[in-house]
């Protein structure tokens, strides 16, 4: 009985030492310098775009689902789309309404 308790305590001690060593190694991964370097990597991959109500000169200046509103001063506004499927649905609805309005005239 005493031997099994000693073996259990020895195993727990070894496990404690291993986990504390892993935690010390992870401190380097969580450091602000490491996070800033990763932030620079991700920013370099992204295209700079202007958010809602940001200034713009053309539609490509604005982020996805935003278009450049030409009212002075020009600003990025929502273009009433959510995704590719939303745009296709809106185009089909426009076609249906337009064809219906042409038939009733």
Swiss-Prot record:
The keyword Hydrolase does not apply. Keywords: Amidation, Disulfide bond, Ion channel impairing toxin, Knottin, Secreted, Signal, Toxin. Residues 1-21 form the signal peptide. The modification Valine amide is found at residue 82. InterPro entries: Huwentoxin-1 (IPR011696). Pfam families: Toxin_12. It is found in: Secreted. Residues 22-48, 83-105 form a propeptide. GO terms for cellular component: extracellular region. SUPFAM superfamilies: omega toxin-like. Expressed by the venom gland. Disulfide bonds join 49-63, 56-68, 62-76. It comes from the Eukaryota. GO terms for molecular function: ion channel inhibitor activity; toxin activity. Belongs to the neurotoxin 10 (Hwtx-1) family. 05 (F4a) subfamily. Probable ion channel inhibitor. The presence of a 'disulfide through disulfide knot' structurally defines this protein as a knottin. This is U21-theraphotoxin-Cg1a 4. It comes from Chilobrachys guangxiensis (Chinese earth tiger tarantula). The lineage of its organism: Eukaryota, Metazoa, Ecdysozoa, Arthropoda, Chelicerata.
């Amino acid at each position: 009985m005493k031997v099994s308790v000693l073996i259990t305590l020895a195993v727990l001690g070894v496990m404690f030492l291993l986990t504390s060593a892993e935690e010390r190694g992870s401190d380097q991964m969580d450091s602000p310098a490491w996070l800033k370097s990763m932030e620079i990597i991700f920013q370099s991959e992204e295209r700079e775009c202007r958010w809602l109500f940001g200034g713009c000169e053309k539609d490509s200046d604005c982020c996805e689902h935003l278009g450049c509103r030409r009212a002075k001063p020009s600003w990025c506004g929502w273009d009433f789309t959510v995704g590719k499927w939303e745009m296709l649905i809106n185009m089909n609805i426009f076609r249906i309404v337009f064809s219906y309005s042409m038939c009733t005239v």
